[in-house]
């Protein structure tokens, strides 16, 4: 769930750029690409749009502009540099004969000992090369921070799809770091996808396999599993993502399919929790209300500017009572806990001719089902204005499914209490609020305070709705 931003703020974010120094090694790890201008030598520097996937943006830029095939290995923050914010380490898979104009290959030793690099460039190359050398062994806990892993992956994918009558054609690296990878492989038939996860999302590996076991109709088919990388190869969903269409029927189909999945999941709650789904059921949330709001009281006292308003202890106390009441009322309704998703956004919903499939379950949880519907609405209101007029139709589609196993009155009441509970559950789900190191990050306290103010607004609207519709 993301808070709304103004059109001006959105336009500003779209136009912002991140600057990256590129450290491109050859596949043997013996040479690095260096840009030369007369007697000056520097690491190449590029800009990519802010808030995008660096692995995808950087590798596509190198392919389209430099005509160079590359693999994104890892990235980091550049220290003591006013000219770049980050560095990206890549492997060129085209050999030493290919390089863009004005950029040459130099041996690592020569580059570090003889070229007039700046201090931060020299440090970045030296540390990156040392990191690659430490990751030579294949049993590393960081499998994607080493040279040659993509070729190994291609061979593994090829060996698993050939028996299915498919052959590899090309690949697109969409996301990645030392422990995480997302690669799309084009084949002679439909595409296949490889995904691997590490901490803090290691649970997605077991969750994805559990969902495939219990609900194969709703998730992509898993073709093969690479256990040592916590990765799996899956088939394509066979359609477009929901965010690519404004057809209200497609959106209604997606939300009705979500309800079907949730209803089917009711009998598998223990299995889902064992697989790693987060427990956001009412008893768990009730225990977190006071600890969370006590922490928010401390963060409110740290706020130095007004507006936005600082919530008083008394306001937080009233909010605590309202959240607890909403949780108790919601759990009293005859609607069972089910599978849910704290980031249920249209980009993770694939709409095909035979129905919908859902991908990316890192934020899977077990909770009251209507919380997931609220997260879906939050994305819709923020990013899809052309679909907002159909919100009532979506609500009706979702409600009709649940009225098959609960009364219409209980479904209506669940819609009353779920907006407030959804914001609270989202705020406490990741435990960032009680991790001292996390709270020290400048943006985190402000974000948590904004979520708390959002809860207060939802609590006030809940009280008004209960007065207007007492029955």
What is the role of each PLM region?
Residues 2-44, 70-71, 350-352, 357-360:
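N-terminal strand-loop-strand
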Residues 34, 171-188, 193-194, 321-373:
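Active-site acidic catalytic loop and adjacent metal/ATP-binding pocket
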Residues 41-43, 80-114, 172-280:
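ATP-binding pocket architecture of kinase catalytic cores
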Residues 43-77:
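The catalytic Nudix box helix
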Residues 116-171:
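Juxta-kinase regulatory segment immediately upstream of eukaryotic protein kinase catalytic domains
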Residues 131-149, 153, 276-329:
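Active-site catalytic-loop/activation-segment of kinase and kinase-like phosphoryl-transfer enzymes
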Residues 245-313, 337, 442-450:
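A cross-family kinase active-site recognition segment
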Residues 369-406, 419-439:
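Active-site activation/catalytic loop segments of kinase-like enzymes and analogous catalytic loops
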């Amino acid at each position: 769930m993301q808070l709304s931003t103004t059109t001006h703020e959105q336009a500003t974010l779209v136009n912002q750029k991140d600057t990256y120094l590129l450290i491109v090694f050859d596949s043997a790890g013996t040479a690095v690409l260096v840009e030369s201008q007369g007697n000056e030598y520097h690491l190449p520097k590029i800009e990519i749009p802010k808030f995008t996937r660096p692995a995808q943006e950087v590798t596509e830029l190198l392919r389209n502009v430099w005509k160079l095939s590359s693999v994104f290995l890892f990235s980091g923050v550049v220290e003591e540099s006013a000219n770049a914010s980050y560095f990206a380490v890549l492997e060129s898979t085209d050999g030493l004969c290919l390089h863009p104009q004005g950029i040459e290959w130099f041996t690592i030793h020569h580059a570090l000992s003889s070229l007039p690099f700046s201090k931060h460039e020299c440090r970045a190359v030296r540390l990156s090369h040392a990191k690659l050398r430490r990751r030579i062994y294949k049993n590393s806990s960081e499998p994607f921070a080493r040279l040659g892993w993509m070729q190994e992956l291609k061979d593994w994918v090829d060996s698993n799809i050939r028996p299915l009558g498919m052959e590899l054609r090309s690949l697109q690296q969409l996301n990645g770091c030392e422990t995480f990878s997302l690669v799309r492989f084009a084949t002679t038939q439909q595409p296949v996808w490889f995904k691997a996860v590490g901490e803090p999302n290691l649970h997605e590996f077991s969750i994805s396999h559990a969902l495939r076991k219990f609900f194969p109709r709703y998730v992509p088919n898993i073709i093969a599993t690479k256990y040592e990388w916590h990765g799996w190869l899956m088939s394509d969903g066979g359609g477009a993502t929901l965010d690519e269409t404004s057809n209200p029927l497609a959106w209604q189909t997606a939300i009705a399919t979500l309800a079907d999945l949730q209803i089917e999941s009711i009998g598998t709650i223990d299995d889902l929790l064992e697989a790693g789904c987060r427990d956001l059921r009412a008893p768990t949330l009730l225990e977190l209300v006071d600890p969370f709001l006590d922490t928010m009281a401390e963060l409110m006292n740290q706020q130095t500017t007004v507006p936005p308003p600082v919530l008083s202890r008394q306001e937080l106390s009233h909010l605590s009572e309202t959240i607890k009441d909403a949780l108790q009322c919601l759990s009293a309704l005859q609607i069972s806990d089910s599978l849910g998703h704290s980031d249920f956004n249209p980009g993770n919903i694939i709409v095909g001719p035979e129905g919908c499939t859902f991908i990316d379950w890192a934020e899977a949880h077990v909770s009251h089902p209507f919380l997931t519907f609220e997260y879906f609405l939050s994305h819709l209101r923020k990013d899809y204005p052309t679909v907002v007029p159909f919100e009532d139709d979506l609500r009706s589609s979702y409600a009709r499914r649940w009225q098959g196993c609960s009364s219409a009155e209980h479904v209506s009441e669940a819609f009353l209490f779920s907006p407030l509970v959804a914001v609270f559950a989202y705020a406490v789900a990741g435990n960032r609020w009680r991790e001292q190191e996390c709270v020290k990050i400048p943006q985190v306290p402000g974000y948590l305070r904004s979520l708390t103010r959002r809860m207060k607004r939802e609590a006030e609207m809940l009280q008004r709705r209960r007065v207007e519709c007492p029955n």
